[in-house]
């Protein structure tokens, strides 16, 4: 080949190689420019995501306190077990699945499946207690597992008092979201704001040094201070449960204790409460057994959900009912405010009235003859109040029905408040009006009713019922205090005072006397309403028995509504069924709240006395001291000096009661048996107690009633006690209605 040809070929090859290199480098430069300027941000994000992990840091849910700062709901530290599938190798996958399955009680195959996800973060189990967390840490250490399992601090809701106040408190779900009660209503306040932790990972999935960590702190939720008083609530729940059992109540009972002047709810209870620590478990044994006996399937699921909804439902806020004769306080206040009646306005009271062709009976066969307006309240005469309703007329009746807040929700800070059902003035017939006047046509919620009656006796003011007094931040500083300013005044202070005085008379000598408490100037009104919807649907007669009372009548502080839905015991009347629960609860609540007794001269004559201390005195001196105290001494033994006495010094004992004195040990072991003291007249009760060698202290209608019958005793029949022991016996007026 010629030399020139070789040189040309070499030059051409060199040029081609240079050109190819230039093109290659150009492409690289273009790619670098594109990566830097066009896709740089996207690729940077991908790189960060591949090397970092973001973990949510839970905020601690705020605490719920009672009015005295006792914690009713709080959050305890638990742990989340989190898998990091991207860092679980085939080598340790089976070891991890086996170990966690044994520790957590989760199916191994489920863990294996979860460990194969294309993810850096997969929650395996929440709410793991610290001892279980420690087991997992030991397992990781024993098997030298550095990545693939994370343990994150979390919080679990805890209710230290169990089922206490559960329909008010509510509960939270597995994700700590409020699902009922205060927990639901104030969920956004209690929840707080989650933080996050961003950490960098190396090639094997373990954390890189601290400088690669970024942390955004969580903000804990605010706390709530309730108006609920734990002591008041316990009194309420215990006595309500006793009343439900005693009266064989079919559809649960409920009660509300409220500050008359501020609307603060001191106690709110519904029988059959659930445990918010385990809210999905059915608390009613009968309901639970019914569900358990059903085969798995749609019907069982439906029954289970119905039972859960029932126990979670707050009847005092969500249910509506005919308030019965308690509503006469509203009709009466309206008529008195309008100047249509005074205490002494006379009414003719046959046993029925015929209205638009419909005969409407009073509760007393034969009627009352003639009653004044005040006597109409104290005798709970339907005939009187049909006439009072007609005096008002539909327009004025509805005007006050609306003014007392009965056409709209109260706005109480609890979820699920029900809506009242009522006739407006335009669609109310004369019959509707007449029957509504004594509480049997329109339907309201218990919280509406107690708020309305509070206005009757507190000077005429509609207050805002509420269960939260304050909101506190994480440091305990006050964020918000509930405004207790009344909404409006619906009747004058004069009308209010006069109505309170009539209602006090009613609790002393009228149909509400089963709620009477000596010294506390109680006022009250009973209610017995027929469940007309049940009658129409089933043909059965079912009733709601209620009692709404307050104290002290001369300066009302506390109001209480007791409500029993379908009582099937000895009576269904509000006075006999709900009155004793009111009296027993208020007798415990009022002294606790510092309400002072003021006795009338008549009450002073009937008061129990305190046993003087005669221990170490001679027999003669002891007898003399007891006689001066209007007590009867009874001596056991042959000694000359008193070595013990029953009742003990300072104990309450009825006037003319017996104090047993021991001069030696010969009689100290001579116990007596408490007899059955219920279902008797006062005279027969005294006789049975005397024959048994015990004393009785009487409460309830025995102090004011005309035909009282004993219905409870503080020490069960058959119990062995020392001679002279005092047994408290409660009395009711069984023929009282309302």
Predicted regions: what is each one?
Residues 1-294, 311, 320, 395-403, ...:
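Periplasmic/cell-envelope proteins involved in peptidoglycan metabolism and beta-lactam response
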Residues 57-60, 67, 75-78, 119, ...:
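Extracytoplasmic
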Residues 59, 87-94, 126-130, 176-180, ...:
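Soluble non-cytosolic domains of exported or imported proteins
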Residues 73, 202-213, 261-326, 330-562:
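Beta-lactam-recognizing serine transpeptidase/beta-lactamase-like catalytic domain environment
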Residues 110-120, 156, 249-262, 348-352, ...:
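Acidic/histidine-enriched alpha-helical segments
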Residues 148-150, 223, 252-254, 346, ...:
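Residues at or immediately flanking beta-strands
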Residues 482, 519, 533, 562-738:
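Ligand-recognition elements built from short beta-strands and adjacent flexible loops
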